[in-house]
Amino acid sequence: MMTVLKPGVTDYATPNDTDIVVTRVLKAPRALVFDAWTSPKHLPNWMTGPDGWTMPVCEVDLKPGGAWRYVWRKDDGAEMSMSGFFREVSPPDRVVSTESWGPEWPETLNTVVFTESAGYTTATLTMHFASKETRDAALKTGMKEGMDMGFARLDTLLAAA
């Protein structure tokens, strides 16, 4: 049975042993969602995870082969970072990139596809992990909760645009 998604609700699926598929319907045109998802002007305003975190470093060279890097800082001074390279950039339809949380985590391949219908954009992010163990470990990090908080901020950002 197919799940009907509503704006403001994020769906998380594990269709196989190595993938997580995250789907979110956003009330905004695709070009605007693509820009918010890829621009260092907008990313620090919504992709911050749980309350108390900021993104003081957001570097994006949005082209095939270009690098990206995010650094988050918690209000107590703790930091975490993630980086990768863009493999494919097709505005406003699709972005494929690698993701690394450091040497202790195997690289992930992320593909996000943006589709628009009747003024709403569906963002479908497929995260491909090296193994079931790595995928399951990612799910146990609080990833869903952090992403849900970020997506709520993205909804607010898009509504104000």
What are the roles of these predicted feature ranges?
Residues 96-145:
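Beta-strand/loop substructures that line and gate deep hydrophobic ligand-binding cavities in soluble
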Residues 17-23, 55, 67, 81, ...:
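Intrinsic-disorder/low-complexity, polar/charged segments enriched in Ser/Thr/Lys/Arg/Asp/Glu/Gln
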Residues 21-22, 41-79:
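Short beta-edge strand/loop motif at the mouth of beta-sheet-based domains
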Residues 33, 43, 68-70, 86, ...:
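Hydrophobic pocket/interface hotspot
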Residues 1-52:
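Hydrophobic ligand-binding cavity/cleft-lining segments
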Residues 24, 57-60, 82-88, 99, ...:
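Hydrophobic/aromatic beta-strand elements that line small-molecule binding cavities or substrate pockets
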Residues 30-31, 62-63, 87-93, 113-122:
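A short, structured loop/turn motif at beta-sheet edges
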